[in-house]
Regions:
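One-carbon transfer enzymes
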Residues: 1-178
Length: 178
């Protein structure tokens, strides 16, 4: 997103990652809100409140999620209604969840791809903004297919975010449609 010239105001991650380093190198605010509790008693609402607080402090308008590994609670979507964008390595609604590429291969699909969508409290279930397909090659394994999808996903995500910035909104209300 940095290389595409998108205005990145803040990078937040739930674990140490390259994105935090890139932000720091470019003088962009970066926050690690690490999830340390992986027990069944994990307080998702408390964690989400922390994320929403950080985003609010930085006056964030649109949240572009990429690789954020913690499912966030309802307060995220209340604070940013229809303004949390996510990417997924499958053609939703097919193969939602963490193992989309593996699931697509196991099912035997001949075509898969990626989806850019509005995130909601239900994982991988929001309105679809963009999709792009790619064939599954005979010699593909999970790694090779996922790499090809990620290449498409990065480009499509940037194009979708640029379109959102150009239009000034994520989803059109009936009076905004062209």
């Amino acid at each position: 997103m940095f290389d595409a010239g998108l205005p990145v105001a803040l990078v937040v991650s739930d674990r140490p990652c390259r994105g935090l380093d890139l932000a720091s190198d470019r003088g962009t605010a970066a926050e690690l809100i690490e999830r340390t509790d992986f027990s069944s008693s994990f307080d998702r609402d408390e964690y989400t409140h922390g994320v929403v607080s950080v985003l609010g402090r930085h006056k964030i308008d649109v949240v572009a999620m990429a690789g954020f590994g913690t499912v966030l609670g309802q307060s995220m979507f209340d604070a940013f209604p229809q303004r949390v964008i996510n990417t997924h390595p499958a053609l939703l609604p097919a193969f939602p969840g963490w193992h989309a590429v593996r699931d697509a291969l196991a099912y035997g699909v001949k075509v898969t791809g990626c989806t850019i969508h509005v995130a909601t409290p239900v994982v991988d279930d929001g309105p679809i903004l963009a999709q792009e397909a790619t064939p599954v090659e005979p010699d593909d394994d999970e790694s090779s297919l996922h790499e090809r999808i990620k290449h498409i996903e990065r480009r499509l995500y940037v194009e979708t975010l640029q379109d959102i910035l150009r239009r000034g909104f994520v989803l059109a209300s009936p009076d905004q449609e062209e």
